[in-house]
Amino acid sequence: MNYYWRWLQGIGFGILMASGATAIQAAEPLPRPLQPLRLSQSYTDLVAVSLFQHYTAGYPAPILTDGLSSREIDSVHLTFVRRLIGEAGDDGSVVGYKVALTNPNAQAQLGVNHPLYGFLLENMLLESGASLPMEFGSRPHAEGDLMVRVGSADINQADTDLELLAALDAVIPFLELPDLIYEPDANVNAGALVAVNVGARYGIVGDPVDLAVDESGLEQLANIRVVLNNARGQFLAEGSSDALLGHPINAVRWLRDTLNSQGVELRPGDLLSLGSVTSLVSLEEGAGIQGIEARYFGLESSERSVDLEVSFEEPEQDS
C-alpha cells in the first residue's frame, strides 16, 4: 500500500457500499499514480473551490486549469470530489466510476488519446420517472449511456473478454445527465474535464439485466441500441453500444487496467458507467425539452425496449 493511498485515506475517501465496507483510492485518470502536492496545494485548492462554487450555483465557469501540471490537475480533481462528498452528506458515498471520452474523435478534440474517468456518488443516481429542475446544472445535457455492475473481484485478474464478462453480474440502462460546467466559448481540454470530475451530475438508472457469461453475453453487450426522444415523442438522438471503444467490454478493460495501474482494485457492487452511446443533447435554456425518454433495445432477449424517463420542471416565474 503506497504513500499516495495512505494520503487519500487521510482525506476521507473511505466509502460504504451495500455489499459492505469498501475503501477506494481516488486517483488521476492517467497512466500512473501521482504523489500528493505540497508547494502548490493552496493554489489548487483555490481552483477546486472556485469550480465547486460554480457547480453548486449552476453558473458556467471559466477555464481555471490552464498551465497546471497533471499532478496539479489531480489535486484539483480530488478536492472537487471531496467537496461533492461533503455537500451530499449521507448520500455522498462513492458507488462507482464514470468513463468519459470513449470516442477517438472526442479524445482528439481534447488533446488526449485515451479515455478519462471520474467518480459516481450515490446522490447522483436517480430512479426512472424522476423530476429535476430544468436548470439542474451550469450547462445541463443528456446522453444515452450504458452501465455494468461488478459481480466479482476476479475482474482485477481477468485476462480474456469472457473472463471480464464473468466478473460482471448485470448490464444496466443509464440515461446520463451530465453538466458541461464551463462557459460555452471555453476551450475545454482533458485537464479541465478531469478537474470537474468529468462532468458527472445526475443519471437515471434502470433495473439490472442479467448477463450471460458466454459468447452470447458479449454479443448482447455489443448490440444494444439507444434512442432518445423528448416528452412529445420527437426524436433527439440515437446510438449503439459499439461507440464504447468498439465494444463495451473494451471500456471495462480500460477502466480496470487504469485503476489497477494506480493500485486500485474494483470491488463487487461497483457501478461502471461506460460512456456515451448517443450524442449529447443540450438541455440549456431555449432547448424547450421538458422531458426525455430513453429507449434501450437489445438489453433483453425480447424485442421490447427497456425505457427510462425523466422530466424537467420549469423555473417559477416572478410575479
Predicted region positions:
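Catalytic-core "active-site belt" of small-molecule-metabolizing enzymes
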Residues: L34-H247, E284-E285, E303-E309
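Bacterial N-terminal signal peptides that target proteins for export
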Residues: M1-I11
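Charged, cofactor-coupling segments
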Residues: G144, E285-S319
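Short, surface-exposed secondary-structure edge patches
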Residues: I73, Q262-V264
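Boundary at the C-terminal end of the N-terminal hydrophobic targeting segment
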Residues: A23-A27
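Conserved metal-binding segment of the jelly-roll/cupin
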Residues: L266-S279
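Bacterial N-terminal signal peptides
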Residues: Q9-G20
